[in-house]
Amino acid sequence: MLLRFSKMHGLGIDLMVIDLISQYAYIQPQHMRAWSDRRCGVGFARLALIEVPQDPDVDFSCRIFDGDGVEVDWLASDLCCVARLVADKRLISKAQMRVEVRQAVLDVQVHADGSVTVALEKPELLTEPTALAQAFIEQPRHAPWRLDSCFTMLTDNSGSHALLRVVDVMQVPMAELLEHLEAHACLPLGSVISLLQVQSRQTLIVQMWQLGAGVIDSFSPDLCALAVLAMQQGWLDRQAQIECGNGTVSAHLEWLENAPQMYFTGSATRIYEGQIRL
C-alpha cells in the first residue's frame, strides 16, 4: 500500500509526520529505520504518528519515535509541527486542541500566523555551584571567557546542566573551552554546557553543547529551564524571546510568577507531502 506522509521542520528539528486518522497502517520499527535514512529513505530526525485518542475528551493522540524506531519523549517542537499539520489538513476543525502524548495531555493552540502555543508544566529547578579545578580557572585576564571559580549547575528533569553567563556568546572560543572542560573532568560526560547572553530584558541568546556529543542546535527542553531560571533571577521579563543555533532557532516563552504552567510559542513549516510504499 501507499502511505501518505508530510515532511515538517520546526525549531531546528525535521520530522516525518504520518496521519493515521484518515488512513490505516501498521508501522513497525524496521519501517522507521529505513525511512529515516537520508540517502535511501525520506530522512528525518524524528517521526510523529497522529492517531485516534483513547480518551474521548482529547482531540488526537501523538507518538514520537527516533530514527531507530524507538518511542521517545515528546518535545514542544514536535507538537508545534504536529498541531500545525492537523490544523492545515483540517483533521481537527478548531484552533485550540487537547493532545494526548506520552504520559501527558497538553493544551495546544494554533494561531492565524501559523505559530503554535503549547502549555507546558514549569520545570522544577535546583541550582548549586560546582567548583572548577584551579588550573582550569587560571586563564589570562584578557580572555573574554575567563571563568569564575564555579559554574552554576542547573538540575531539572533532563539532567545536569552547567551554565555560564557571558557578555557575547560569539566571542567565546567554545572548542577551546570544551577541551579544557573535558581535560580537567570538571563536569561528567554528557553534561549540557550553556552560554547565556542577556541581550535585553526581552531577549535571551543561548549557545548549547553536550560534552562528548557536540553542539545542540535545536530547541531542547533545557532551553525552557534556562528561560525560567533567567526570569527567576530577574534577568528577563516574564515574556521573552529565546534564540539559539546562532539565531536560526527562536521561540517565545511566557511564565507568570508562581504559575504552574509556562507557555511556549514556536513556528513550524510544512516542507512537502509524499507517499511511500509500506
What name fits each language-model region?
Residues 152-153, 160-164:
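Selected transmembrane alpha-helices and immediately adjacent juxtamembrane segments
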Residues 103, 122-124:
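Short, flexible active-site-adjacent loop segments at beta-strand->alpha-helix junctions, enriched
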Residues 126-147, 155-156, 260-278:
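C-terminal domain-closing interface element
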Residues 116-120:
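Intrinsically disordered, low-complexity regions enriched in acidic/Ser/Thr/Pro/Gln residues
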Residues 1-24, 132-156:
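N-terminal, positively charged, Ser/Thr/Ala/Gly-biased leader segments
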Residues 1-112, 162-278:
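A glycine-rich beta-to-alpha transition motif near the start of alpha/beta enzyme domains, typified by
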